[in-house]
Amino acid sequence: MSNARQSLVIAAALLLAACTSTPEVISPSTVATAPQTARVTAGLESYMQQRARVERVGFRLRHAAAPACAKTNETKAELGLIVWSLANFSNDEDRAHLQGAFALTNAVTVALAVADAPASRAGLKAGDILTHVDGVPLGDGKGATERFIQLSNAAAQSGPVRLTRAGGKTVVAEPQIVCEFPTLLVRSPEINAAADGRVLAITTGLFELTHNDDELALILGHELAHNTLGHLKATEPKEKPGGLLDAFVRATIGTAVAKAVTRPYSIENEKEADYVGLYLMARAGYNITAAEAFWRRLNETTRAQAVTATHPSGEDRLHALQGAISEIKAKQKAKQPLEPNLKPRQ
């Protein structure tokens, strides 16, 4: 859904906190950071509720698309876990808010265990304090969340990961293979979503137009399809694991300025992403019939925007979606593999 005339902040710095689904960490050169005292937690409770849905739907889709991503060596083993600590926040008001609203301390704490992902299936939940990864102590305070990212990601690539909670109880999470593209929820009233070959992003403005997970899966599936199809391969090198969690936070809340990127796709690319995105939806177990009503509603909402240069017209898009839905349903009825009928690439 990227608009050639609209910019969308989708750099990995938009992550709210340390996330085991993306060990790559933005370097100082890629983020224009706000002053260290900028406040970031206003409205955080509602944002985290929204993000939980985005992470859940994104994880399912990325798992469903893993066979396609494996062909380009773009998969990884993930736990579906986001952590944070007070050490990631420098503003006194933020720290007080997080202590009161989330009982956050300087210990490595689960901010979000993605529903139906390995960590949550192992029994982890928001608020759990983590002390060890495979027996290696995490410590607390500065650097602890970064240490967790590095240890847990390294462990996940070789098998089950043992995570020890405060009190000594250890759970074992079996990593799941997914496409390596993290899913970002960007705080912006703009109605947009994007993919740049490295990440998927949706704005809160577009998120709030969705009525259920099926509609959210339609959007994220479309963006994921852009990446799996290689419509826009990232030209920038991926960063090595590291720190800067405060930059993640500031960028997401909007008090820092990350790079804005314009990612135009051709009309043919958009049609292909619509088509393949529906297949990813179906393979992930979502209701593809939600597509028609949502696109009608979205088209009505955004028809004043100048997107026709890079997007199919509303009626053309709906007609193509209807055809794809019929095709997928026929394959489901015949118990055939849900593989899109793509033309060979030149």
Q: Each PLM stretch: what is its role?
A:
Residues 15-18:
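C-terminal motif of bacterial Sec signal peptides marking the signal peptidase cleavage site
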Residues 22-76, 255-310:
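Short helix/loop segments within enzyme catalytic domains
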Residues 41-108, 174, 185, 189:
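PDZ/PDZ-like peptide-tail recognition elements
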Residues 94-113, 129-131, 182-213:
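Active-site scaffold of zinc-dependent metalloenzymes
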Residues 146-184:
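PDZ-domain C-terminal substructure recognizer with occasional recognition of PDZ-binding tails
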Residues 232-258:
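Post-HEXXH active-site segment of zinc metalloproteases
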